[in-house]
Curated annotation (Swiss-Prot):
GO terms for biological process: proteolysis. This is Pyrrolidone-carboxylate peptidase. Removes 5-oxoproline from various penultimate amino acid residues except L-proline. The gene is pcp. Homotetramer. It comes from Staphylococcus aureus. The active site is at E78, C141, H165. GO terms for cellular component: cytosol. The keyword Protease applies. Belongs to the peptidase C15 family. InterPro entries: Peptidase_C15, Peptidase_C15-like, Peptidase_C15-like_sf, PGP-I_bact-type, PGPEP1_Cys_AS, PGPEP1_Glu_AS. Its EC number is 3.4.19.3.
Amino acid sequence: MHILVTGFAPFDNQDINPSWEAVTQLENIIGTHTIDKLKLPTSFKKVDTIINKTLASNHYDVVLAIGQAGGRNAITPERVAINIDDARIPDNDDFQPIDQAIHLDGAPRYFSNLPVKAMTQSVINQGLPGALSNSAGTFVCNHVLYHLGYLQDKHYPHLRFGFIHVPYIPEQVVGKSDTPSMPLEQIVAGLTAAIEAISDHDDLRIALGTTE
């Protein structure tokens, strides 16, 4: 498969974003997949246009977006995105939407059509912390996952799409002993394992849900 993997620019006055740092270190061939890479701005207003232009000028079987989830302690494939922008902080354009629909003609939610349980289990099988997430938040990460679902629904019926959140890396949590992090090389290994699990097969039917 031809897979586009995206990461984000730093945001919230940080100098680094582990999503893009990890994406840049991915091999260009992973398993049977050819990997292209794209850096996205942390901008509600810009990401849609960039994604639209990229998909219009290239054929991709899969788009997999990667984002930072500070405070998480695992690599977490996302199951679903919701049709809301509700930003706790401004984005890099100083834009802070509150309770705004992403697409007025879109569904209330879009589920990733990637094998998210198989991807999660593949991370775990590498001895790395992995978990299936049921919330991508309401910032630009959720926005991108939702927009990809919208494009698949309205324009690219054969497109497969998904999102993975990754933790901070250690240099982001210096002096913050209670904040989890993960070495960059482990994030790269986890993303590689997750990408290797992407296939045309049905997802695994295993218990990776939560009770709360």
